[in-house]
Amino acid sequence: MAPTAQVAKKGSKKAVKAPRPSGGKKRNRKRKESYGIYIYKVLKQVHPDTGISSRAMIIMNSFVNDIFERIAGESSRLAQYNKKSTISSREIQTAVRLILPGELAKHAVSEGTKAVTKYTTSK
């Protein structure tokens, strides 16, 4: 007589899993990529005592994705106009100047330049 279900022995470390009823295949969940942890880190740098709701995080993530796509698209177009196959920091900088308005573009360019300088000196 063969047992139909596995029984865990006393003191065993592994948990016994119930058999899968449908097809027997394990489903792999697709991971959702997000800027959430980075948004949270920046929030804590600027306002350490402030939190963020999950809905606000979704909106911020959508905003970052939108800006990223706009800058990537514009810098791609600029590279094509100049017959270049590589997007450099110069194309990114020009795209930021074209997309973001006035003072916001100046701040973004200065922060971007600072980040590139920090990256190149750390190598």
Curated annotation (Swiss-Prot):
Keywords recorded for this protein, A-Z: Chromosome, DNA-binding, Glycoprotein, Isopeptide bond, Nucleosome core, Nucleus, Ubl conjugation
Covalent crosslink: Glycyl lysine isopeptide (Lys-Gly) (interchain with G-Cter in ubiquitin): K118
Segments of skewed composition (Basic residues): 10-30
Annotated localization: Nucleus; Chromosome
GO-annotated molecular function: DNA binding; protein heterodimerization activity; structural constituent of chromatin
Region described as Disordered: 1-30
Known glycosylation sites: S110
Oxidoreductase as UniProt keyword: no
Post-translational modification, as annotated: Monoubiquitination of Lys-118 gives a specific tag for epigenetic transcriptional activation and is also prerequisite for histone H3 'Lys-4' and 'Lys-79' methylation. GlcNAcylation at Ser-110 promotes monoubiquitination of Lys-118. It fluctuates in response to extracellular glucose, and associates with transcribed genes.
Domain of life per record: Eukaryota
GO cellular component assignments: nucleosome; nucleus
Subunit (UniProt): The nucleosome is a histone octamer containing two molecules each of H2A, H2B, H3 and H4 assembled in one H3-H4 heterotetramer and two H2A-H2B heterodimers. The octamer wraps approximately 147 bp of DNA.
Family: Belongs to the histone H2B family.
Biological function: Core component of nucleosome. Nucleosomes wrap and compact DNA into chromatin, limiting DNA accessibility to the cellular machineries which require DNA as a template. Histones thereby play a central role in transcription regulation, DNA repair, DNA replication and chromosomal stability. DNA accessibility is regulated via a complex set of post-translational modifications of histones, also called histone code, and nucleosome remodeling.
Matches recorded under PANTHER family: HISTONE H2B
The protein, known as: Histone H2B.2, embryonic
Originating species: Psammechinus miliaris
Organism ancestry: Eukaryota, Metazoa, Echinodermata, Eleutherozoa, Echinozoa
